[in-house]
């Protein structure tokens, strides 16, 4: 079973006490192609393209211009935000991190698909960004990432793709070309008799599910039904086929 999650806007490049070796991202040529585009953007263009403030545009202009000189960090430790904070990567054992290395992919607008220990540099390029040269990054990446997932799952015992990514990032999947079943996870809350997704709580739960998978070395969708967090529990009556629903 292979899990996908979205990358995050927020980064944390402070040093950590991780002594393992970093690995290399799978698509360096495509990353360099994208870098060549955004390096030529002015701060005004970056602000408009990425829908960010002038301050953030200035920061990312500097990041792109000095990209090769920037320090690198393992992706699982470099991203922050609600999902990654709840993965609690700093507290994972070496065995748990090594398990995720072959069972987790982080979907990124700049890097495509990252293994947890792949070395990344500080950047911001969301999948929703509309570059002048590439209007839809998810379509741009679609075949590369789908083929990469197919190739990865060929070597797994349980050939399922667990989707814990947002709609923005899971749209990179070409479901017509994906060879293996997708398991979609939904976190719902009972609000006035109706089930609704509360964004921030769902993000936290997705991160904690990755933590649960890592700590318990889970490689089968059936074992996910034991997951509970923030009051979310598996609901068989609300789940259907490959859509697993957790309700609180």
Swiss-Prot record:
It holds the Pfam family H2O2_YaaD. GO terms for biological process: response to hydroperoxide. InterPro entries: YaaA. One of its GO terms (cellular component) is cytosol. Signal peptide: none annotated. Belongs to the UPF0246 family. This is UPF0246 protein A1I_02510. It comes from Rickettsia bellii (strain OSU 85-389).
